[in-house]
């Protein structure tokens, strides 16, 4: 094989590859063995047609595409390795010369990973946020636990207050006409939760059980149902029942109820403080790392190929769809509620996708500049962590991952971020 790489404008170039005649003829032989299984000619059993008769009847050219399908997935990766290039997209292949008994010549138009011109990345002036947890923070968290353990008790008398849960009937009208989805009976609503259209819940405060009221609101301009967005509406409301939260006492019994690992409120308080400290520290560390990467990336210069942005966009779309699925939704429903389509969502994500690509390229360049390496032992340690996290044997993790090259690159990027933190 001979390989020639010609760099062109931007991040594109043309790879010219010549595959020797022996290798090409072997691919033709393999193509014939595959194709002949489906060929029937009178006088011969299916799959037993002689090669010479096959070529006489159908022409050797009929084998070329199958031979290319066999050859290119093997020879193209060899060619890019020999040329020392790093493609970021599928190549555009053109066959320049193809003939039985001769060498095969093909070209591949390739977009390659761009060069990064690093700016300042050491001594970046980024301060880590204070991760101190105050007694007020702990008390606020305990109050939240207390609130979540509260029981709803029917108010025998008295009016609706913020935080109460009401059972009500409602029916909405726009321009005097009822609209789809605007009616419910015996609906439970926590007043002040912000679950309904702005202005609706506030107008329930002060009403008593049995009260009826016309609640006037205006749908937000960005409301998911376009036929209602920005329009005034009237909801006829009837209050059936009002329930108030009855908070449990903050004592040792409460502590044991919310956490079986503690015996006293003091233990729960201490455990809560440690948990908040860990969460705040992780948040501060995460923000620090994010800001350092952002600054280093802003200081770097790189011409990002559109192909890399498109690949990142596809990855972000998949991540977004997975998050929706975890919430019991899919893309189709999301588009229906948001009034967006896939193109609009991708357009919205495009800037972030480009930033992600630039940040990653910058970190890879920093890792190369500082000669940051990842050992086999570090990869093995990461695999062990994954096996523990997924509660699977490490061999199963290795089998699922296959090659660990991508993991090595991820760990190298992580080391580059560690370097930024240590040298800020």
UniProtKB/Swiss-Prot annotation:
UniProt-annotated location(s): Cytoplasm
Cellular-component GO terms for this entry: cytoplasm
Keyword Cell inner membrane: no
Domain PPIase FKBP-type: 163-248
SUPFAM superfamilies: FKBP-like, Triger factor/SurA peptide-binding domain-like, Trigger factor ribosome-binding domain
EC number: 5.2.1.8
GO BP: 'de novo' cotranslational protein folding; cell division; chaperone-mediated protein folding; protein transport; protein unfolding
Primary enzyme class: isomerase
Principal subcellular localisation of the protein: cytoplasm
Reactions it catalyzes: [protein]-peptidylproline (omega=180) = [protein]-peptidylproline (omega=0)
Keyword tags: Cell cycle, Cell division, Chaperone, Cytoplasm, Isomerase, Rotamase
GO molecular function, one term: protein folding chaperone
Database matches in InterPro entries: PPIase_dom_sf, PPIase_FKBP_dom, Trig_fac, Trigger_fac_C, Trigger_fac_C_sf, Trigger_fac_ribosome-bd_bac, Trigger_fac_ribosome-bd_sf, Trigger_fact/SurA_dom_sf
The record's note on its domains: Consists of 3 domains; the N-terminus binds the ribosome, the middle domain has PPIase activity, while the C-terminus has intrinsic chaperone activity on its own.
Family stated for the protein in its record: Belongs to the FKBP-type PPIase family. Tig subfamily.
Function in brief: Involved in protein export. Acts as a chaperone by maintaining the newly synthesized protein in an open conformation. Functions as a peptidyl-prolyl cis-trans isomerase.
Protein name (record): Trigger factor
Native source organism of the sequence: Bacillus pumilus (strain SAFR-032)
Upper taxonomic lineage: Bacteria, Bacillati, Bacillota, Bacilli, Bacillales
Name of encoding gene: tig
């Amino acid at each position: 094989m001979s390989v020639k790489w010609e760099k062109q404008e931007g991040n594109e170039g043309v790879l010219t590859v010549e595959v020797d005649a022996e290798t090409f003829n072997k691919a033709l032989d393999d193509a014939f063995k595959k194709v002949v299984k489906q060929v029937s000619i009178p006088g011969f059993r299916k799959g037993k047609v002689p090669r010479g008769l096959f070529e006489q009847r159908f022409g050797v050219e009929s084998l070329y595409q199958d031979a290319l399908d066999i050859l290119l997935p093997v020879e193209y990766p060899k060619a890019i390795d020999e040329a020392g290039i790093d493609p970021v997209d599928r190549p555009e292949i053109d066959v320049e010369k193809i003939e039985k008994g001769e060498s095969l010549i093909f070209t591949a138009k390739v977009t390659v990973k761009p060069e990064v011109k690093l700016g300042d990345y050491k001594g970046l002036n980024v301060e880590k946020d204070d991760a101190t947890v105050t007694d007020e923070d702990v008390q606020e968290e305990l109050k939240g636990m207390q609130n979540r353990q509260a029981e709803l008790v029917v108010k025998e008398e008295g009016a609706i207050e913020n935080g109460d849960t009401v059972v009500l009937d409602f029916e909405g009208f726009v321009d005097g006409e009822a609209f789809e989805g605007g009616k419910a009976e015996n609906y439970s609503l926590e007043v002040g939760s912000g679950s309904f259209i702005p202005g609706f819940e506030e107008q329930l405060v002060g009403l008593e059980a049995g009260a009826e009221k016309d609640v006037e609101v205006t749908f937000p301009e960005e409301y998911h149902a376009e036929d209602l967005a920005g329009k005034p509406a009237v909801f006829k409301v009837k209050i059936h029942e009002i329930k108030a939260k009855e908070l449990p006492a903050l004592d040792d019994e409460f502590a044991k109820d919310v956490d079986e690992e503690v015996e006293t409120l003091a233990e729960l308080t201490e455990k809560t403080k440690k948990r908040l400290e860990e969460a705040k520290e992780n948040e501060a560390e995460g923000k620090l790392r994010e800001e350092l990467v952002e600054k280093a990336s802003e200081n770097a210069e790189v011409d990002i190929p559109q192909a890399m942005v498109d690949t990142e966009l596809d990855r972000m779309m998949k991540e977004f769809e997975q998050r929706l699925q975890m919430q019991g939704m899919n893309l189709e429903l999301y588009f229906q509620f948001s009034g967006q389509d896939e193109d609009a969502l991708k357009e919205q994500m495009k800037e972030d996708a480009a930033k992600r690509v630039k940040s990653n390229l910058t970190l890879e360049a920093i890792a190369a500049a500082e000669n940051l390496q990842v050992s086999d032992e570090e990869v093995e340690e990461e695999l062990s962590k994954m096996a523990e996290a997924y509660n699977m044997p490490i061999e199963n993790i290795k089998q699922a991952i296959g090659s660990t090259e991508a993991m090595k690159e991820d760990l190298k990027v992580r080391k580059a971020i560690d370097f930024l933190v240590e040298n800020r």
